[in-house]
A protein has these predicted regions:
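Cytosolic regulatory regions of ion transport systems
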Residues: 1-289
Length: 289
């Protein structure tokens, strides 16, 4: 293990992925993140109290370059040693060794991250849906609750036979399957409507791209409709994803519709076989228009 591990203050990496806790799911997670079809393979740092559980790269080439911080991910020192401030994403896996109290450790870890790096993108695995309300007071960006996902996928598979195969295809990283990608709105489409951008992307037939939704940031509100603020008094922003925005309607008060004007910071979600390059194609169509 020592041959691919070094002191965390020697890592010197940025824009990396931090995986908190090492579980049975970690192996597949690493292999998906470092799949040959992934164009931008980010460095991975694992924070775990059991580094001996992480395979050595001599056993599996996928693990070459994996860096390890021995410690509890809910400890701020462990997070700092892993370079939390310069990380692209933090993935918090439920510590399966803690069984029913695994979500409690996850909450403690998110609070620690909120305190020292509130702007980092955080994805958490939650085991019990009853614990979801506790995350309303954190800056977590994405919550994966296996309990809810399993129930909903089972129900949808009954209502729409075969739908599970669609999800399996989209969630498998390879050159032969479609994946979901997120792209920033090209500068020359800022101020234009989602519908105008959709038509331009549809015209890029040679790239085999399907536009499925819009991503934007909005102020997070509580159950009473009040804007939530952090401990500095700043509004808490949350990412919203609108799949297939509807036509503008008087009966709907949503601002995200087909005629919504795109702003800086918005993103589009696309389905494609590989990471698409829409910038060049859209620039050509924009110039012609």
């Amino acid at each position: 293990m020592e041959n691919n591990t070094k002191l965390a203050n020697d890592f010197g990496v940025e824009d990396h992925i931090i995986i908190c806790n090492w579980t049975k799911k970690s192996d597949l997670l690493v292999k998906e993140l470092h799949n040959p079809s992934v164009e931008k393979k980010r460095p991975i740092i694992v924070i775990t109290e059991n580094p001996q559980d992480v395979p050595d790269f001599e056993e599996d080439e996928t693990y070459r370059g994996i860096m390890i911080v021995k410690g509890n991910p809910s400890n701020e020192d462990s997070l700092i040693r892993a370079g939390i401030g310069s990380a692209a994403t933090v993935i918090i896996l439920a510590d399966e060794k803690l069984a029913d109290v695994a979500d409690s450790k996850t909450i403690m870890t998110t609070i620690a991250i909120d305190h020292i790096a509130p702007d980092v993108h955080v994805v958490v695995e939650v085991l019990s849906s009853s614990n979801l309300p506790f995350f309303d007071y954190t800056f977590v960006n994405e919550i994966i609750c296996l309990e809810l996902l399993t129930e909903r996928l089972l129900a949808q598979s009954c209502l729409t036979p075969g739908v599970s195969f669609i999800f399996a295809d989209l969630l498998t990283q390879s050159s032969d399957t479609n994946e979901i990608y997120v792209e920033d709105i090209p500068t020359h489409y800022i101020g234009k409507t989602f519908q105008e951008l959709r038509k331009a992307i549809v015209a890029l037939d040679e790239q085999d791209i399907i536009l499925i939704g819009l991503g934007s940031s909005t102020e997070k509100t509580d159950s009473g409709g009040e804007i939530m603020v952090d401990h500095h008094g700043n509004s808490i922003m949350e990412k919203v994803l609108i799949i297939n925005p509807k036509a503008k309607s008087k009966s709907s008060n949503t601002k995200f519709h087909k005629d919504y004007k795109l702003i800086n910071g918005d993103q589009v979600y696309l389905i494609a076989y590989s990471k698409p390059n829409i910038e060049v194609g859209l620039l050509k169509s924009f110039s012609k228009g």
